[in-house]
Amino acid sequence: MNEEHYQTVVDKFIFTVKRGLFYAENDTWVKLENGRVRVGLTDYFQRRVGDVVYIEFPKVGIDVNRSEEIAQLESIKTLSSITSPLEGTIVDVNQALNDKPEMINEEPFGKGWLVLIHPLNLKNNLNQLLTAKRYFELMKVKLENEMKQSDKENK
């Protein structure tokens, strides 16, 4: 484990949780930026869905509530509805993902970000999110449950 990330290895995969961000149970991350928040998908989420091939965003300027859809993502494995970890107004979307959706897989905590939101009541929104350490523990439980389920299916 290094200073910037928490990491765990499952099978041959390394799952990373970046420190200094907030996380939602729906496997999105939130980064504070000058009163706005940048939202992206976690490493766990992108590994679970596989290679991302397409993403569709809402219009800039719309208001979103917590748990309301902010993107539709298509991967080689599934179609996923991505929901907002907080409430606010979408002020920007990552247009670069239209041409290179695979950036979500390649750089989930960097160039693979999804949307920029001007949050309503930032403090209240942040109180509903998890710290990196708490999300890391939740992710490990999810991974353990998936491994148990996989073991049952393979018997």
Question: What is each PLM-predicted segment?
Answer:
Residues 61-76, 117:
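A structural signal for short beta-strand/turn segments enriched in small hydrophobics and glycine
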Residues 1-60, 93-155:
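Non-catalytic terminal segments and appended small domains
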